[in-house]
Amino acid sequence: MFKIGVMVESFRKGLDGGLKAASEIGADGVQIYATSGETHFDKLKGANLVSLRTKLKDYRLEVSALCGDFGGHGFQIAEHNPKRIEDTKRVIGVALELGTSIVTTHIGVVPDEKSNPRYAVMARACEKMGAFAENEGVVLAIETGPENAITLKEFLDDIGLKKGLGVNFDPANLVMVCRENIPQAVKTLAPYIVHTHAKDGVNLKPVSAEQLYNSFAEGGIEGFHATDYIREVPLGEGGVDFDSYLKVLSETGYSGYLTIEREVGENPTADIRLAVEFLRSKVGKKIFPGRKN
């Protein structure tokens, strides 16, 4: 059955505080950003790496995945890709050191039209990273959201790697941006799903994925406000029907992590605790007290 994870950064308490909080609310594991702050891949080596391993062991937490998201436009811009590809390879190396075989990332907006030059640019970058990941026994999991499930599946099919590329399934992104039918999206992407985010949201009015993600990449666009179009909400309060979603996800054979990602809210710890309780109730597991105070 599913495991419950939490993104350490969602607590907004730093690494130590986030690990402690994750243990206290009964998470099975954590996802950690490896591209910024104290867990940047450049810093996770030597004594720092040993220290993190020790903390994870003490709190009895495993790493569900590393987040290797570099922000910006992902892998849409050819001249930026060589460095991003090499940095992603380094994140993959850190993932192995921490005992996880999954690295998640946003790659940008995959064009609907395969004739769009950006499609080939992104495919080449993903092929290089995916081939490296496959050789290392790791899966680079592309997060859902900017494009619909069919477009992403065809993109992965076109690249043709058997193991090195996968999907980090975020149902809220698909609801907020694409207004997707989540159970159907799961069925479409099932062969590739290796990790998921537990998040909920609503689409307030139709929005262009290009415009929305360009706004995120560029730190805002004058006259465009993302919150006019999409809104993240607590689990169970948005457009994701978790009963049908988890049922179909289970039927596909997925038994990995449901990793809570909370990017808004004034009291993230309280929100995450409620999210854990919500998910435990759905998967039939009892809440248990923190492992270490």
Cite the ranges covered by each PLM segment:
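Active-site acidic/histidine proton-transfer and metal-coordination neighborhood
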Residues: 14-20, 55-62, 74-167, 176, ...
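C-terminal/domain-terminus segments
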Residues: 256-279
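Residues at the N-termini of beta-strands
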Residues: 29, 102, 195, 256-257
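Alpha-helix N-cap and loop-to-helix initiation/capping positions
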Residues: 43-51, 79-87, 114-124, 147, ...
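N-terminal pre-domain/capping segments
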Residues: 1-100, 191, 276-293
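Acidic/histidine-rich catalytic cores of soluble enzymes
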Residues: 4, 29, 66, 124-239, ...
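A short, acidic, amphipathic alpha-helical segment used as a generic capping/interface helix at domain edges
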Residues: 237-251
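Active-site beta-loop-alpha junctions enriched in small/polar residues
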Residues: 7-11, 33-35, 68-71, 108-110, ...
